[in-house]
Amino acid sequence: MIVTDTFVAARRAMSGTVGLVPTMGYLHEGHLACATAVRATSDCVVMSIFVNPLQFNDPSDLARYPRSWDRDLALAERVGVDVVFAPSVEEMYPEPPLTRVIVSGVTEGMEGSRRPGHFDGVATVVAKLFAGLRPDSAAFGRKDAQQLAVIKRMVSDLGFPVTIVEVPTVRESDGLALSSRNVFIEDRRAALGLSRGLFLAADSAGAGERSGRILEDIAGRTASRAGALVDYAELADARSARRIPTLDRPAFLAIAARVGAVRLIDNVVFEPDGSADRGTRLDGPSILGGS
């Protein structure tokens, strides 16, 4: 495995078809699943590790984001990553950027309205990675459903020749969606309220419920009763990420809540017939240390 911090060296290390896994480090099984997914169609798997300052609204959140360099390298090598690209802020942004990628519409609700500028930072860094590394494919997890919609729209609008590989949410054995921020969770019962609410809503949809309001209410009330401070529960169109009143198209039910000092997000992805992708569960404890 080759580790480099410059675009030039990373490109020199790559050969054949390239699959990219963009990350901010502190790897977990969700990131590793993304690497496995692009490996199936790629000669070379590149994983970027870069904590992108442009997507943080709060400087203290940026400073607090967990980091684990040696552990990340060991995990990347274990799953067969060929190149780790870990640039400095100066490599990614030689000067304070005057140009940003803004994907309107799809960023207006949910996380976009709560975290102004967040998705501009995400789209900008991903566009730079695509331009600098020129991958043939890139893997993104369905756990960040709105982010996935943003990236797919950016790729379509700007004509990047990159195939986006969607990877199902990876969950701990008790259902908690994996996130690097899970290490900060102190009240696990409250945190589990998010996934349990989503699963109950998915059960209801599977039984025929199509009302967005009712599905949102099931998810939100369940999480609240568990002790989570719910920010929103919204049924959204999978492509536009706009809120919809009825489950009658590909969609996702997203929830965001605060558990203590940690803000968590989760979702389930729906087909129009009410069937749901709830993600995959680990058989045992996560490498992050959870259940």
Would you name each region that the model predicts?
Residues A254-A261, E271, L282-S291:
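Low-complexity, glycine/alanine/valine/leucine- and proline-rich hydrophobic stretches
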